[in-house]
Amino acid sequence: MDSTYMPLAAKAGVLSAKVVPSSGGETEFADMRAAYDELAPSTIEKISKLSAFHSLYQSQAKNGYKVETGKGYGYHTEGAPLRPLIKKHPVTGRNALCIGRHAYKIPGMDDKEANNLLDSLLEQACQQPRLYKHSWLPGDLVIWDNRCVLHRACPYDVSEPRVLQATRISGDPMSEFAETGADDLASAFEPSKANTLSL
């Protein structure tokens, strides 16, 4: 799910291919509804009342990057949104896992245990037959429901250009807004008056 690190997450995502490499660079999409459906009842019970904070700072730090607050989309001072691990789709009512590389801390749980749980859920979720891999051609356009689908780029030779234009469609505040807590990798925390949550 994209933009879960923003207080108001997107409800849909769009990618349009302009220039593609000769090989690799596909985009994989994973269905988080199907991933939820495959969970053991004991796992569903364990995670049903859990939530995780989501942060672009944290996910980028895992990859060795440090970005200053205010230096791009997602690097804001509104804090890290707290989102339930199980999300009910506002239109279909179907449950989906709300995880991904931006999820990093579960309140009330040791950080190592939380990371292990989140990594395990993500690993299980992103397996066949829940994956679709799109091999890009110039001019392709893919639209997905961001409320229940994860996506990621596949490796490619970075000496070749790969240009995809991304667009996000803003979510409905009733279903996509999440209160935030302070993000220790951001230089400031300026929540809205409704946000009283802290880490």
Where are these regions (language model features)?
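Non-heme Fe(II) oxygenase catalytic core, chiefly the N-lobe of the double-stranded beta-helix
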Residues: 1-141, 146-199
